[in-house]
Amino acid sequence: MNEEGGYLGAMTYQCLYSPVMEKIKQQHRDDPRASLALNKLHTALTTCEQASPSFLYDFTKVLLDDSELSVNLQESYLRMHDTSPTNDLIVSGYEQNADYKELTKRAIELRRVLSRVPEEMSDRHAFLETIKLIASSIKKLLEAINAVYRIVPLTAQPAVEKRKREFVHYSKRFSNTLKTYFKDQNANQVSVSANQLVFQTTMIVRTINEKLRRG
């Protein structure tokens, strides 16, 4: 698995297939046979994702290659984060806890504001305003992570701290990529860095969920 397949692969079901599946389910909600078939397909896709996070990504690339469509996957994924489901950013079983709710809120906000990057890069003023919002969202998410760190079980703290350090690392990388962009105008590299930051945001919540399930 290459690096792109790693972070985009892990987001493929949530970003691409889940919204499509939900739309089709709604269209056929009055057809029991169709609903049963769609549920089986949903189970098969999620099983594939769990067994091999890059499978759906690789499958999507094959479909695109066979259809001879030219699609910038980095930009497309980033745009889709604006409307993709957010259940992967919820701390399951702790939805009413103020600190976990704040973490979810800030994670969603960061993902949504990052999704605006491709649309606004061509307008320097709008892009600079979006960059300010991203910086503010990163700061608020870090504050939420610190608050959650204090209430998770002691056994979970090292893993949360590790994810936080990785998030900070990719936040700095994103900042450096933006500085470079204003010199070389490499828009795709900005999308790459933004997607990596979205992935790190997801991994923070995923790690917290895993540690809380284990107690």
UniProtKB/Swiss-Prot annotation:
Transmembrane helix keyword on record: no
Gene null: resulting phenotype: Animals are sterile and develop slowly. Excretory canals are approximately 45% shorter and are characterized by a discontinuous and wider lumen, the presence of cysts and an increased number of canalicular vesicles which are swollen. These defects start during the L3 larval stage and become more severe when reaching adulthood. In addition, cdc-42 expression levels and activity are reduced along the excretory canal length. Animals have also a reduced distribution of Golgi and ER components along the excretory canals.
A single GO BP: endoplasmic reticulum organization
Entry annotated with the keyword Transcription regulation: no
GO cellular component terms listed in the entry, alphabetical order: cytoplasm; cytoplasmic side of apical plasma membrane; FAR/SIN/STRIPAK complex; growing cell tip
GO molecular function: protein kinase binding
Tissue spec: Expressed in pharynx, intestine, germline, vulva and excretory canals.
Topology with respect to the bilayer: Peripheral membrane protein
Subunit and interaction comment: Interacts with gck-1.
Family to which the UniProt record says this protein belongs: Belongs to the PDCD10 family.
Function text: Involved in excretory canal elongation during postembryonic development. Plays a role in promoting Golgi stability, ER integrity and vesicle transport probably by regulating the activation of Rho GTPase cdc-42. Involved in fertility.
Protein name: Programmed cell death protein 10 homolog
Gene for this chain: ccm-3
